[in-house]
Amino acid sequence: MAVNVDAEYLKEIEKTRRDLRALISSRNCAPIMLRLAWHDAGTYDAKKKTGGANGSIRFKEELNRPHNKGLEKAVAFCEEVKAKHPRVSYADLYQLAGVVAVEVTGGPAIPFTPGRKDADSADDGELPNPNEGASHLRTLFSRMGLLDRDIVALSGGHTLGRAHKERSDFEGPWTQDPLKFDNSYFVELLKGETPGLLQLKTDKALLDDPKFHPFVKLYAKDEDMFFKAYAISHKKLSELGFNPPRRIPSAVTQQTLGIAVAAAVVIFTICYEASRRGK
């Protein structure tokens, strides 16, 4: 069903944002909320124009798939907020939860444009397999219409949370403080394996691949640059399968312009660093 993004809907979005901020802070559930947003959006197929950020993960058929183990808790948390703001679509709610999860843990502000439609059935779509390497990551992310720089930036989201044996057959956090959003994921990658910290095959692929590696080095060195890149890529992820309304509030338009400028800065820096190494 179409979402009418009028003034009242925008007010509901802001109230929803406040309630999500309070819930995520009080429950320490930022990692699982970020995972929910990613898994709902990550089913997108750019060629087929199917899947994406459409709230379909609320359906049992999708929620019960092996790669979504544990997310029923995040869906339940969101239901508490949905009960207060029934007009807000599930698709908007789940993506806003991911945005807020990053912000309340110290990460960058991510522009959010509401208006996503809810799916009426579960999506198909493969998500990353932690036992695979760089070619697997490229295949999945290119299916979504995302690029190498998006793969590396979004992988930095592993700075939040930990893997659980009962969900993924892996156990442990990626960083020393799994409730703080920073660039430590990349710092730890460059340090090599550390007792008690997790490095999956998909993580190590970022080091081994010659196109991924420069981004890892840059983000480990410059947290501000990582934050800018992450905000760009997270916004893209949150809008997979969604065409934002043409008429949006000026504040949102200004934020989007800022993201575009930041993207240019990141790309320029990568090229500059590469040219320096080539001299």
Swiss-Prot record:
UniProt cross-references to Gene3D superfamilies, sorted A to Z: 1.10.520.10, Peroxidase, domain 2
EC number in record: 1.11.1.11
Membrane topology classification: Single-pass membrane protein
Reaction catalysed by this enzyme: L-ascorbate + H2O2 = L-dehydroascorbate + 2 H2O
GO cellular component: chloroplast; mitochondrion; peroxisomal membrane; peroxisome; plasma membrane
Keyword annotations of the record: Calcium, Heme, Hydrogen peroxide, Iron, Membrane, Metal-binding, Oxidoreductase, Peroxidase, Peroxisome, Potassium, Transit peptide, Transmembrane, Transmembrane helix
Swiss-Prot/TrEMBL site (Transition state stabilizer) positions: R35
Protein's cellular compartments: Peroxisome membrane
Short name of one Pfam family: peroxidase
Region (Disordered): 111-134
Enzyme class, spelled out: oxidoreductase
Chief location of this protein within or outside the cell: membrane
Cofactor binding note of this UniProt entry: Binds 1 heme b (iron(II)-protoporphyrin IX) group per subunit.
List of catalytic residues: H39 (proton acceptor)
Cofactor(s) this protein requires: heme b
UniProt cross-references to InterPro entries, sorted A to Z: Ccp1-like, Haem_peroxidase, Haem_peroxidase_sf, Peroxidase_I, Peroxidases_AS, Peroxidases_heam-ligand_BS
Residues that hold heme b according to the record: H158
Chain residues that bind K(+): T159, T175, D182
Parts of the chain that traverse the membrane: 251-271
GO molecular function, one term: heme binding
Further comment found in the protein's record: Binds one cation per subunit; probably K(+), but might also be Ca(2+).
Function: Plays a key role in hydrogen peroxide removal.
Family, per entry: Belongs to the peroxidase family. Ascorbate peroxidase subfamily.
Subunit structure and binding partners: Interacts with AKR2A and AKR2B.
Protein name: L-ascorbate peroxidase 5, peroxisomal
Source organism of this protein record: Arabidopsis thaliana (Mouse-ear cress)
Upper lineage: Eukaryota, Viridiplantae, Streptophyta, Embryophyta, Tracheophyta
Name of the gene: APX5
